Curated annotation (Swiss-Prot):
<comment type="subunit">
    <text>Heterooctamer of four alpha and four beta subunits.</text>
</comment>
<dbReference type="GO" id="GO:0006523">
    <property type="term" value="P:alanine biosynthetic process"/>
</dbReference>
<comment type="function">
    <text>Catalyzes the pyruvoyl-dependent decarboxylation of aspartate to produce beta-alanine.</text>
</comment>
<dbReference type="GO" id="GO:0004068">
    <property type="term" value="F:aspartate 1-decarboxylase activity"/>
</dbReference>
<comment type="similarity">
    <text>Belongs to the PanD family.</text>
</comment>
<dbReference type="InterPro" id="IPR003190">
    <property type="entry name" value="Asp_decarbox"/>
</dbReference>
<feature type="active site" description="Proton donor">
    <location>
        <position position="58"/>
    </location>
</feature>
<comment type="pathway">
    <text>Cofactor biosynthesis; (R)-pantothenate biosynthesis; beta-alanine from L-aspartate: step 1/1.</text>
</comment>
<dbReference type="InterPro" id="IPR009010">
    <property type="entry name" value="Asp_de-COase-like_dom_sf"/>
</dbReference>
<keyword id="KW-0704">Schiff base</keyword>
<feature type="active site" description="Schiff-base intermediate with substrate; via pyruvic acid">
    <location>
        <position position="25"/>
    </location>
</feature>
<keyword id="KW-0210">Decarboxylase</keyword>
<keyword id="KW-0670">Pyruvate</keyword>
<feature type="binding site">
    <location>
        <begin position="73"/>
        <end position="75"/>
    </location>
    <ligand>
        <name>substrate</name>
    </ligand>
</feature>
<keyword id="KW-0566">Pantothenate biosynthesis</keyword>
<keyword id="KW-0068">Autocatalytic cleavage</keyword>
<feature type="binding site">
    <location>
        <position position="57"/>
    </location>
    <ligand>
        <name>substrate</name>
    </ligand>
</feature>
Length: 128
């Protein structure tokens, strides 16, 4: 049996901008991508903490250190600049892999600066 498990997430990110004219996606600072172990073109589930909306899109790599979290295309209608969101990736694995899997969690501040990071069930690594 194959299971879909949380692979990684960026928690409490703040939307910095939106571009309705772009073809789609979410642009994320490449430094945050590295820290959260996410990659360009990876499918993400995004949850808007302000309005409860959930939507799927894919990642575009933003400039390193820019702290950009930009929603593009139709996704730009799902959250406004200043909204707090959670960005999640998932992986498919068998039960044996799932037994030892520990998702990566990156928590950011109101300016999208990394505050701390940890694998679920392990201690935080302070980053700021």
């Amino acid at each position: 049996m194959k299971l879909h498990l949380l692979k990684s997430k960026i928690h409490n990110a703040i939307v910095t901008s939106g571009d309705l004219e772009y073809e789609g996606s979410i642009t994320i600072d490449s430094e945050l991508l590295e820290m959260a172990q996410m990659i360009p073109n990876e499918k993400v589930l995004v949850v808007n903490n302000n309005n409860g909306e959930r939507f799927e899109t894919y990642i575009i790599k933003g400039d390193y250190g820019s702290r950009v979290i930009q929603l593009n295309g139709a996704a730009a209608r799902c959250a406004l600049p200043g909204d707090e969101i959670i960005i999640m990736t998932f992986a498919v694995m068998d039960e044996k892999e799932a037994g030892s899997h520990k998702p990566m969690v990156l928590i950011v501040d109101r300016n999208n600066n990394p505050k701390r990071r940890h694998r679920v069930g392990e201690e935080d690594e302070l980053l700021s």
